[in-house]
Amino acid sequence: VYDEQNYIFSGTISALAFSPIDPSYRYVLTENGRFYYSTDSGLNWSATPMFTGPSGHYFYGSTILPSSTYLGRVYIGGSGYSNSPVYVSQNHGQNFSEMNLGLPNTLVFELSSTLDDNIIFAATEIGPYAYLANQEEWFLLSGLSAPDQTYWSVDFIPEINTARFGTYGRGIWDFVLDENY
């Protein structure tokens, strides 16, 4: 059943997500970097005070990745040229911390993660990245074999233990995790 909820955000919605653990938690990131969260299925919204996150790409937007393991953990990504390209919240977006160690100033188009959140993948303007939670750092995945170009999308496919990245003009690139990850 479709039910339109009226709410005036401070800008155009650039990304929207629902918690996979409890879909009554909803998240919005606007094109001007404002983050909003709802705890009641979108009936009421709160803005993160004193926070401006990454803005989105003019055509592609920004990205929100709610954790599938920890209720309240939310990752956001977007333009990181004058601020961090990725942030994380542990409390549904009431406040955020930068998450940029090892990640250069770039534009993050999409985030995805392993089911346990131990690895966060980022499709960026300058290549594919992975954040290792146990090291609290981002690492470039391209090495010598991946195309050197923009990576627009990423999805983690748990059935085959693979992060699948989509590039701009060079096809699909799979990063397969072995049993030691």
What is each residue range found by the language model?
Residues 1-181:
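Extracellular glycan-interacting surfaces
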